[in-house]
Amino acid sequence: MTAKSKFRGSFTALVTPFKNGGLDEAAFRGLVSWQIAEGTHGLVPVGTTGESPTVTHDEHKQLVEWCVDEAKARVPVIAGAGSNSTAEAIGLAKHAEKVGAAAVLVVTPYYNKPTQEGLYQHFKAVNDAIGIPIIIYNIPGRSVVDMSTDTMKRLFELKNISGVKDATANIARVSAQRAAMGEDFNQLSGEDITALGYMAHGGHGCISVTSNVAPRLCSEFQTACLKGDYATALKIQDKLVPLHTNLFIEANPAPVKYALSLLGKMSNTLRLPMVELSEANREIVRQSMVHAGLLN
C-alpha cells in the first residue's frame, strides 16, 4: 500500500473473542475468514469494538498478527494502533507495519484532552515513525476532543496521513473535509446508521460494527453506494436499520457479541468493565437480526 492508498467499501471493526480468560484464536481466525468469504472489503482489528482498552499490549499485537496472517493479503488490514500516549501509539504502529498491516487506525488521544496543536504533533510523530498509511480516528464522543478540518488539512500534507474514520455523526463534515482535502482524502464513516447519508455526501466507505454480523449486506450496501445506486442502497438500509440502531442499545460491543453468539461464531464473553447484554434487550437484538434475514 502506498501512503495515499485508496480505501473503499465496507471495513469490519472486528470484535475480539475471549475464552477462559484469554483470547479465542480459533474464533477470531474463523471470524476473519468468514468476513472475507462474505465479501467484506477490509478488516480493522483492535479498535473500540475490539475492546482495545481491555486487552494487554501483547494481546493487541497478537490480534493484529493473527488478522494479517488469516487475511493472507486478500483484503487490507487496517490495524488499530491508538493510544493517548504518543510513544505507545508509535510502538503499536511500528509493530503493525512490521507484521504486514496495510495501514493503521490511530485514535485522537483520549482523556488527556490535547489542543489542536497537540493533536497535530501526536499524529506527526506517528507519521514520522512508520511508512504505511494512517487513518485518523476522530471520535469526540469517546475521546472528548474533536479534530478540526484545519488540523486534518495540515496533517494530510504529511506523507502517510491518508484519511479519517469519522465518528462525529455530523454528515456536514464530509463536505467540509472534501472541500478542504479533496477526493484523495479517504473518508470512512464510523457510524452505521448515518453511513447512507455519509456516502451520498462523498464518503468512500464505512468502518462498521454491523458488518460483524451482516458482512454480506454491508458489503452489498457499500458497493451500491460506490456505484451511485442509491435505490439499491436504500433497500439494503431498510433491512439493516434495526440492527444499526439496536447494536448500540447498550454499550458496544455487548450487543454485537451477543448477536455473533446467536450465529454460533463465538461465546458471548466480554472483559470488565464491559458486561454482557442484559436479558431485557436480547430479544430486541434477535428480532433485529430476523428483520435483516440473518435468523429465522
From Swiss-Prot:
GO biological process, alphabetically ordered: diaminopimelate biosynthetic process; lysine biosynthetic process via diaminopimelate
Compartments, record wording: Cytoplasm
SMART domains associated with the record: DHDPS
Site (Part of a proton relay during catalysis): 48, 111
One cellular component term from this protein's GO annotations in UniProt: cytosol
Enzyme Commission (EC) number: 4.3.3.7
Oligomeric form and interacting partners: Homotetramer; dimer of dimers.
Xref: Pfam families: DHDPS
Top-level class of the enzyme under EC nomenclature: lyase
Name of the protein in question: 4-hydroxy-tetrahydrodipicolinate synthase
GO molecular function: 4-hydroxy-tetrahydrodipicolinate synthase activity
Active-site positions on this chain: 137 (proton donor/acceptor), 165 (schiff-base intermediate with substrate)
Residues that, per the record, bind pyruvate: 49, 207
Catalytic reactions of this protein: L-aspartate 4-semialdehyde + pyruvate = (2S,4S)-4-hydroxy-2,3,4,5-tetrahydrodipicolinate + H2O + H(+)
Similarity comment: family membership: Belongs to the DapA family.
InterPro entries: Aldolase_TIM, DapA, DapA-like, Schiff_base-form_aldolases_AS, Schiff_base-form_aldolases_CS
Pathway: Amino-acid biosynthesis; L-lysine biosynthesis via DAP pathway; (S)-tetrahydrodipicolinate from L-aspartate: step 3/4
Protein role: Catalyzes the condensation of (S)-aspartate-beta-semialdehyde [(S)-ASA] and pyruvate to 4-hydroxy-tetrahydrodipicolinate (HTPA).
Keywords associated with the record: Amino-acid biosynthesis, Cytoplasm, Diaminopimelate biosynthesis, Lyase, Lysine biosynthesis, Schiff base
